[in-house]
Structure formats: C-alpha cells, structure tokens
C-alpha cells in the first residue's frame, strides 16, 4: 500500500535582493559556513537564487537519499565546477552527463585503479612518506609545522611519482611547487567567478588574467610530462601509460591528446588536494580527542611495532580506518555535490521530493551539503557533531543506512581514485604515529576553514617529537629496513637527557597543564627559583612529557583540573599515562605534583593533579614529596604554591639529590635602564585580533553595571553556542598611574630590561633586551592586582631595612595566619603594600620580577552563529567596588578585564580567541528537546545565545513547514534586582518569547514596590510539578552563575528529586516491588552523576 502524497509546501529560503538574489547571503571567503548556517535556520531544504539562477540546498539524509537515486537524478556540473571546465574541459570530474570523452576516459582508467595496481604503488608511496618523516625528524620538536603545507607536499609528490613517474621533490624546497600555486589560484578563482555574472568574468581584470595564466601553466606542465613519456616509453603500469596507451574496451578508441591533458590535471589536483585536507583534519581530530589518538597509536604499536610498514599491515588497522571514515564524515574535503533531474530516466512533472512535499522548478538542480547530511542526528544520534571513530568501526559502519556516508561522491560519478587515496592516508597516519608524538602548537586552537572548491584547516600548526628510542640520525635507515632492524635500532638509541645549562647546574624538568595561564605561570616561577637551588629547569607543556618522562633529575608536574578534565595541553599526556602497562615503566623517575582546582566542582575537585600523582607513582616512579594543592577560588594561590615549594619540594630535592644552593644573596633580579622620550610596544601572543562593533550598557543607574559587546571575529574563526571568548585585558589606567607615581617614572618613561646575570630567570613573559614603554609594560604585560604572597612580603620586608618598624610589620603579617588571610580577603596587592608603606625601598627590577604575567579571561559567548557567524557577543558585569585595601575612601577596586572591556569603543581592536566549552554546556540539536535554564545577573549570557539560536531555527523551519506548530518548551529562570533596571536583554527575550523560543520567568531580589524579593530557586520550587514533568519528558537543565546560584539551584533540584523519589518508592511498596536502600544523599548524588554523564544537567559556574 503506497503512502499518500504530502501536501506541497513552499521551499523556504532567505529573501534576496533584486538582480543579485541571494549572493550577499553567501560568504565570499568560506561559502560553506554560510550555507550550513542557512541549513540550520531553514531546515533540510532551502532555495537560493543568484543572478536569476535557482538551486535547492539539501542538508538531511532523508532528502539526500532521494536525490542520490541515479534512476531519478544525475550529477550536475554547476558553480565552481562549471568554471573549471575552462581549464579541464570534459575531464572525469567536470564532464556533463553523456559526453563521449568522459565515457571513454572512465572505461580506460578504471583498471588503473584496481586493487593490484594500487598495491604495487605502495613502495613509491612509502618513499615519499619517508621524506616527510625525515623532514619532521630533523626539524626537531620545537619547530612549528604548518600541517596543510607539508601534507600538500606529500600528496602532490605521491600522485606525481606513483601515477606519472615524475618527482616534484617538494620537500627539497622551502617554496611550494609552482603547480600548487597555479592550482590554488585556479580553484579559488573558479569559485569566485561562479558567484559573479558572466559579463564581469569577461573583463580583463588582474584576477581574470591570473586565472588564464594559471590554466596555461597547468596545461603546459602536463603537456611536458606527456611528451617526455612518449619520447621515453616505459612498461610501467601507471596512470600516465594508461592515459597515453589505453583503449576503450567498448569502442576501441583511445583518449585524445586534449583529453589526456584534461585528466592529468584532474588527477594531479584531485589526487592530492582532498587527501592533504583529509590528513590535516584527521590529525586535528586526533589531537583534540586524546583517547582516539591513544587508541590509534596503540593499534600501530600492536600491529606493526618498530618494523617497516608493509602493504599487508594496512588491512589490519581498523581503528585508523575508522578515524579516517569519521574525519571524512565530519569534514568531507569536497563538501558539496550537485545533481539534477535525469534528462532521460526521470519523467516526473513536476519533480518533487519528500513524497510530494517539495516541488522543484523545471530542471532545477540540487546541491547536497555533505557535511550536514553526514552529521544528521536522525542517522548518527544526538552526538552527531562529535568525533567518535568507534561509530565507524566495521560492525557499525556496515549497518549505516544507504547514502549516509558519501565523501567520495555517488554512483557512476564517484571518485575512481578512492583506493589510491585510502591506501596513502592509512600509510601516512601509521608511519607518523609509529615514529612521532604530536601536540598542537596552540592547544586552544579550534578548527578554522580555508576554502577553494575544497576545504582544509587554516592556521593549523603542530609539533612533532620523535618517540622514545628514536633519533633522526638513524631513522632514515630504519625506515628502509626490512624487518626487525628498526626495532633493534630503537632499543639501542635512547633519547639523550637534557644537557646541563652550565658547569654547576643540574638538570630539572617542569611540565605544566594550563588553559588560562595560571599553572604555566607557576611552572615558570618554580623554574626561576631553580637556579638559586643549583638547577637549570626546562619548562614544557605536559603533553611534551608523553612517552618520555626524563630520569636525569627532578620532574615536576603542575596542572589544573577543568570540570574534571585535563587542560588542553595535558590531555594527551593524561591519556597516555592512564593507559600505561607493564612492570614499573616509570622506574627511575623522581617526581612531584602541584595541582589547582576550584572547590565549586566538588565531585571533580583536583581530580587531574591527584590522578597524575597516583598514576605516576603506581607505575614505578619515586614521589619526592606530598602533592601540593591550591584552590583558585581563593585569592592567595601564589602563597600556597610558594609555601609548598619552600617547605616540601625543595627540601625533598635536597634530600634526594643533595644540596647545591647557590645563594640567598639579595641582589636585584634585573638591571633596569630608565630613559624617556620613547615608546615601544612589543607583545607576543597566540591570540588574534577582533574588532569591537558595538559596546552597550544594559542597566540603569543604581545597580551594578552590565554591558554587552559585539565583536567582529578574525577571519576563519568559528564558534558554537556555549563556547567562550578568551580576552587578553589591559590593566586600568588608574592602577598603572599608581605604579608610575610610586616609582617616580615620567609618563613617557622607557625601560630596558636585561637579565642581571646569565643564571637569572630564563622564563620571562615581558620584553627583554629591548626598550619598552614603562606604561605599556605595566598596562599590558603583568598583573598588578594579584594579592601579595608570603614570598612577596619577605622581599618587601628585606627592602624595608631602613625602616625597622615597617620591616617588623611586614614580617608580622607574613607570620600571623590571621593577618595574612586578610591579604587575600581584601585583595591587597604588592602595589597596595608599596603605597601603604612608602619607606619600602624596592628596586623597580625586583618589582617587575614579583609580578605574574597577564593572563586571559574567559567570557561566555552570548550570541548564536546562526545570526552572523562572523560576529559574536559577550555579556558581562563590570566589577567596580570600594577597595578593601584603600588608603582613602575614594579608592576603588576595579576588575581588570571588566574595566578594560567596559571602556572599549567601536572600531577598537582586541586580542581574543574562541575557546570551546569542555562540558555538554550547549543547546540541544533538536527543537523537540525541552530546556530548563537557571541563572542570575550576567549568568544570562550563554542562555541569550541558546535562545537566539532556537529563535533562528524556529523562524526558518516554520517557513519551511518542517516543524510542529510549537517547539518543545524552554523555560528561562533569570535572577536580577529590580524590574526595569537590570533585567538585561528584556526586549530581545520578549520578542523571542512571542514566537515560542522561550518562556522567561524573572526573579527580582529587590522589587521596586518594596515587597519581599525572590530568587530563581524560589520560582523553581513554585513550578516544581511542571519542572518534574518536563524533566521526565527528556528536558535538559542548565545553570550559569556564581557558586551561590549554582548551589541554590542544586538544592532545589535535590528537593524535587527527593520528593519525586519518595512518591515512586511509595507506589512501588504498594505494589510489593523492591526499592533501593540508598540513603537520600547517596541516591541524589547517583542521580546527579548520571544526569551529568548524559549531559542532561550541566553547569557553568564562575567566581
């Protein structure tokens, strides 16, 4: 019985402008991003029109499965591919259906890509891959690797050698082969030309002239290769011989000279461009997901070990195969396919999709957004956006519905070079994981795209360190060894220990795991101290210690715990450490651990440092001293760290290795020359520049100020709802002026900072050996408001020797726990103490040395990329309060970052970067999932983004008829003081409420009518029946705010849970069913842990 036809509905889409249509809705640099955003807004199908030409964009598996039916639809050459026909005419990828040259070439070339021929290319693939391995081995672990560039060299040289017997020798030149520049130029310009009217493309512009020059270069190069082969024939069964000598088994015809050139260019481009992108994405995914990286490397170790890889090994790497499948699912490097109604087989009039729901125009093509189709949650589940290779192992991959994975195209027009690309990718990944440990150059890097007609990561750098037992000198011969020689070599050549940095200094290694810079600052602080104890300390990220923890001196691990997870630059180390096996593999290591955490994350408080401390010890290492811990919720973490170092770590090092203290002499840390009349700014950052578009005050007088800032993001930067924006701030000018005044510096003073001696601190985060404006130094490089530590007090006391009364006072504060606690509680900084005690005679060099480096601050993004992916907003409170350390009543305590942000104006530039949320703190993919959001004050920020995202989806999908009348309920509980004064974003939320995106329930703690105030937890308890019903129907709960808000909401949820639990227990007892014996606290904690695991209860708590 056939399904009744659906009622046709209009195909939705953005409104265009006259003549140009939707051309302005499509980004010029990364068109894919805007096309996918429109799919999120308008649903599984939408229509675009440019210059009178329309096409439908498809983003769901259900509709894609229809148009992949080759009885109804066939490949359509349009947009950028149509423009490429100027260069490669009717080659395999650009031919229209029915063109004779395509049919001949397809039948001639298919045998060249048969399994045996591909396997016979293995040795040549291995030869080029060896060149890549040796380049990275010789560069060493400090070298930043531009991943896409070197993978481009690899794949271009591989296709040239294997398919055409030609060596481009790309690894022997700093510059890319001219073929690459011409290819990129042609592909990019073809895409640009496809978005312009034909008249403009015929104008003699610089870009158009370069386009034709690139085409000429590519064709002439291939003509030269063909002519050389014809003059020097060979029996090699490669692609070039097939092109020249092959005959069509159906017609007996050979390929024409022009067709040979067309397809040579096609294969040189297709044979390397997409594979280099896929390899780059694969390594990005593995480095972002340490567990997957660990499994892939363990598979290589288990299957291949240290011997030379063989072609037979590639069939025994199911996990690496899954990594590649999952990579191509998330980021198909050829991101779209165009189809149109089959001109001879499809007799529908009109042509429809969705069982008659969507009516296509006559001969209207459809473009399939493969990335969206392959991330369809109806096929891949709610975690469809996440990288999980396990879903692509054979047992799961083979059960996928038809057409759910299409990165190589469809049917007759699918990529015939797939076996070649697959063998090459598996070989390269296996060889690299066999020989190197990798880490991102910037662990906070999130994927950015570069698009021509294909996509690649942009600005993606990593570092490669040879694995334990390998060195560059012997690796070349080991790679060509036939069997066990590689393994024998590895066993015989261990890594050399770190060299001593001076005749009397012993080696020491300090590893840090840090996202915000606190633990890195501690690591450098400890390394600075090491010289005076007789050690030369190397400071590296924790990931650098993976696979090779040194045994030639003390090793210190300093790491934070972020919501129970390791920092970005410690994730691979932690994964490796957790998987260590064998009998005491870390025997001979002498270590200590210092950890940071935040007490509001009770269930995961200090989890990572404690686990590192336990696991390193359990694997045979010697623990030098007890773990040191600092709660970042307290202001005085520096003193906690210094105390641990002075009372635990350094005495333990002396006991184990002997004392080699080089002094307690009170010499200045820096020599400083002061001059004026110059201003120099030097700032080395791993952030990018954003532009302030708008800075708006959201509150009225009488309440703490809250603002929202809209930023224009750096090119290629992407974000998702729930992500953070990291900002590098500048100290308030009033605070900087206090420094200038205290040290009697004129406003234009210039400092030149040098090390006082060669053994002075090596780990400096300020400009050295160059002139820098004193104002810039104190404004941008250092933290001026950090509470003073006990060590700071000791330095100040020594500098107050001329005033015994002040000296005694400072010593008393340091030694009295109650008085010292006030330093943290009142946020009294070194600068505050210098102002309070003017007789302290502190050298400016010592003052600079006491200041920690400026760190970034993270703010929840309060916008949705569906509105504009090139912009994002933050919403924040401005911290401005009476100073508890004030010398006068007029003094105020100013939040460093919030003050800086509040003073920004439109057009000003800011150093920033997007940081992903490490939890499930993101809105549901589907509008059918209910939401409960609770916040107070600026905790509203991420929820504004969530609701904005829902509103855009609702508007788009309603216009397409692809969603029910009402989406699932989304309730927002928002705490504020007084209606009309600080109920921020009220107008926007009211508009979104009208379309059903949210229900806003405000709790006013200080109502204007003088009535009793309420808080979000009070409103939630009033609505408990509704909330329990929502939760039992699948709702997700989100909480954002201070610890007070988080704890209060948690208590409300606990109360509701226990009430509902008691009701369920009563009913069960009445039915004679068993009930749990857990006490109430245990039952609630189990429930909460389960909800967190399922990402149905997530929090974002800030100080």
Swiss-Prot record:
This is Bifunctional cytochrome P450/NADPH--P450 reductase. Residues 508-649 form the Flavodoxin-like domain. Keywords: Electron transport, FAD, Flavoprotein, FMN, Heme, Iron, Metal-binding, Monooxygenase, Multifunctional enzyme, NADP, Oxidoreductase, Transport. Residues 685-924 form the FAD-binding FR-type domain. Residues 492-1103 are annotated as: NADPH--P450 reductase. Residues 1-491 are annotated as: Cytochrome P450. The record marks 274 as: Important for catalytic activity. The keyword Kinase does not apply. The gene is CYP505A3. GO terms for cellular component: cytosol. Heme binds at residue 415. The keyword Oxidoreductase applies. Its cofactor is heme; FAD; FMN. GO terms for molecular function: aromatase activity; flavin adenine dinucleotide binding; FMN binding; heme binding; iron ion binding; NADPH-hemoprotein reductase activity. FMN binds at residues 514-519, 561-564, 596, 604. It is an enzyme of class 1 (oxidoreductase). Functions as a fatty acid monooxygenase. Also displays a NADPH-dependent reductase activity in the C-terminal domain, which allows electron transfer from NADPH to the heme iron of the cytochrome P450 N-terminal domain. Its EC number is 1.14.14.1, 1.6.2.4. It comes from Aspergillus oryzae (strain ATCC 42149 / RIB 40). It holds the Pfam family NAD_binding_1. In the N-terminal section; belongs to the cytochrome P450 family. It catalyses: 2 oxidized [cytochrome P450] + NADPH = 2 reduced [cytochrome P450] + NADP(+) + H(+); an organic molecule + reduced [NADPH--hemoprotein reductase] + O2 = an alcohol + oxidized [NADPH--hemoprotein reductase] + H2O + H(+). Induction: Induced by nitrogen limitation.
């Amino acid at each position: 019985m056939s399904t009744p036809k659906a009622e046709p509905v209009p195909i939705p889409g953005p409104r265009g402008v006259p003549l140009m249509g939707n051309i302005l809705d499509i980004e010029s640099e990364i068109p894919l991003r805007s096309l996918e955003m429109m799919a999120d807004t308008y649903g599984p199908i939408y229509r675009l029109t440019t210059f009178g030409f329309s096409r439908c964009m498809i983003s769901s598996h259900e509709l894609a499965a229809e148009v992949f039916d080759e009885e109804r639809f066939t490949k359509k050459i349009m947009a950028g591919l149509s423009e490429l026909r100027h260069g490669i005419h009717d080659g395999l990828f650009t031919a229209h259906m029915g063109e004779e040259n395509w049919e001949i070439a397809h039948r001639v070339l298919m045998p060249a890509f048969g399994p045996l021929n591909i396997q016979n290319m293995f040795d040549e693939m291995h030869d080029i891959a060896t060149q890549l391995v040796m380049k990275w081995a010789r560069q060493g672990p400090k070298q930043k690797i531009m991943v896409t560039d070197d993978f481009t060299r690899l794949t271009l040289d591989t296709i040239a050698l294997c398919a055409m017997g030609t060596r481009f020798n790309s690894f022997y030149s700093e510059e890319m082969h001219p073929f690459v520049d011409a290819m990129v130029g042609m592909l990019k310009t073809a895409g640009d030309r496809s978005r312009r009217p034909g008249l403009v493309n015929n104008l003699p512009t610089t870009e158009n002239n370069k386009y034709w020059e690139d085409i000429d270069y590519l064709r002439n190069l291939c003509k030269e290769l063909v002519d050389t082969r014809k003059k020097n024939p060979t029996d090699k069964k490669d692609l070039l011989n097939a092109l020249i000598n092959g005959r069509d088994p159906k017609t007996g015809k050979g390929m024409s000279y022009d067709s040979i050139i067309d397809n040579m260019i096609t294969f040189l481009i297709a044979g390397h461009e997409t594979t280099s992108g896929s390899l780059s994405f694969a390594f990005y995914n593995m480095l972002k997901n340490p567990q997957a990286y660990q499994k892939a490397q363990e598979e290589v170790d288990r299957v291949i070990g240290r011997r030379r890889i063989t072609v037979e090994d590639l069939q025994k790497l199911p996990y690496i195969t899954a990594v590649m499948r999952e990579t191509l699912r998330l980021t198909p490097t050829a991101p779209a396919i165009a189809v149109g109604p089959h001109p001879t087989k499809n007799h529908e009039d009109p042509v429809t999709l969705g069982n008659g729901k969507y009516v296509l125009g006559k001969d209207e093509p459809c473009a399939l957004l493969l990335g969206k189709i392959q991330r369809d949650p109806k096929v891949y589940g709610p975690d469809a956006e996440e990288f999980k290779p396990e879903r692509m192992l054979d047992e799961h991959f083979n059960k996928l519905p038809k057409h759910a994975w299409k990165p190589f195209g469809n049917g007759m027009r699918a990529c015939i070079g797939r076996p070649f690309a697959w063998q090459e990718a598996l070989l390269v990944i296996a060889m690299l994981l066999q020989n190197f440990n990798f880490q991102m150059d910037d662990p906070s890097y999130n994927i950015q795209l570069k698009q021509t007609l294909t996509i690649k990561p942009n600005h993606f750098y990593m570092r490669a360190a040879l694995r334990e037992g390998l060195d560059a000198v012997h690796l070349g011969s080991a790679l060509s060894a036939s069997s066990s020689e590689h393994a024998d070599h590895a066993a015989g050549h261990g890594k050399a220990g770190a060299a001593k940095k001076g005749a009397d200094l012993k080696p020491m290694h300090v590893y840090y795991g840090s996202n915000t810079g606190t633990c890195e600052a501690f690591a450098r602080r400890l390394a600075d101290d090491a010289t005076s104890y007789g050690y030369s300390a190397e400071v590296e990220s924790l990931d650098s210690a993976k696979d090779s923890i040194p045994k030639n001196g003390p090793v210190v691990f300093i790491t934070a715990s972020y919501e129970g997870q390791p920092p970005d630059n410690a994730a691979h180390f932690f994964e490796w450490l957790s998987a260590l096996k064998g009998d005491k593999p870390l025997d001979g290591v002498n270590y200590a651990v210092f950890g940071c955490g935040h007490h509001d994350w009770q269930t995961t408080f200090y989890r990572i440092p404690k686990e590192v401390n336990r696991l390193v010890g359990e694997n045979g290492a010697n623990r030098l001293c007890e773990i040191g811990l600092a709660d970042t919720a307290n202001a005085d973490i520096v003193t906690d760290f210094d105390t641990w170092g002075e009372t635990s770590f350094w005495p333990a090092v002396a006991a184990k290795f002997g004392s080699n203290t080089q002094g307690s002499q009170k010499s200045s840390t820096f020599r400083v020359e002061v001059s004026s009349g110059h201003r120099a700014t030097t700032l080395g950052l791993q952030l990018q520049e954003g532009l302030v578009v708008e800075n708006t005050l959201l509150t009225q007088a009488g309440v703490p100020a809250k603002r929202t800032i809209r930023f224009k993001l750096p090119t290629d930067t992407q974000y998702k709802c729930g992500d953070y924006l990291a900002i590098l701030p500048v100290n308030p000018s009033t605070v900087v002026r206090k420094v200038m005044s205290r040290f009697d510096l004129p406003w234009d003073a210039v400092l030149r900072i040098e090390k006082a001696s060669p053994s002075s601190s090596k780990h400096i985060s300020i400009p050295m050996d160059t002139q820098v404006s004193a104002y810039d130094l104190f404004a941008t490089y250092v933290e001026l408001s950090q509470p003073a530590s006990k060590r700071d007090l000791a330095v100040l006391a020594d500098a107050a020797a001329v005033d015994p009364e002040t000296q005694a006072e400072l010593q008393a504060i340091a030694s009295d726990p109650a008085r010292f606690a006030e330093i943290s509680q009142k946020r009294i900084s070194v600068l505050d103490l210098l102002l309070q005690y003017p007789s302290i005679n502190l050298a400016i060099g010592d003052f600079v040395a006491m200041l920690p480096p400026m760190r970034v601050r993270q703010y929840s993004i309060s916008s949705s990329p569906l509105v504009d992916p090139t912009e994002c907003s933050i919403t924040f409170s401005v911290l401005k309060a009476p100073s508890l350390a004030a010398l006068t009543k007029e003094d105020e305590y100013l939040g460093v970052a919030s003050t800086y942000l509040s003073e920004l104006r439109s057009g000003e530039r800011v150093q920033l970067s997007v940081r992903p949320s490490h939890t499930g703190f993101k809105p549901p993919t589907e509008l059918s999932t209910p939401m409960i959001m609770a916040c107070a004050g600026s905790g509203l920020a991420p929820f504004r983004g969530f609701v904005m995202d829902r509103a855009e989806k609702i508007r788009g999908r309603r216009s397409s008829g692809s969603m029910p009348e009402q989406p699932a309920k989304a309730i927002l509980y928002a705490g504020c003081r007084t209606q009309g004064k600080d109920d921020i974003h009220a107008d926007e939320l009211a508009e979104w409420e009208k379309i059903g995106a949210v229900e806003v329930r405000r709790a006013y703690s200080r109502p204007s009518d003088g009535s009793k105030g309420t808080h979000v937890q009070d409103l939630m308890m009033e609505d408990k029946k509704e909330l329990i019903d929502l939760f039992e129907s699948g709702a997700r709960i989100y909480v954002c705010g201070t610890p007070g808000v988080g704890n209060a909401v948690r208590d409300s949820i606990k109360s509701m849970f226990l009430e509902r639990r008691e009701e369920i227990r009563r009913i069960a007892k009445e039915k004679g069913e068993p009930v749990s014996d857990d006490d109430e606290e245990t039952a609630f904690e189990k429930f909460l842990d389960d909800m967190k695991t399922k990402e149905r209860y997530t929090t974002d708590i800030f100080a």
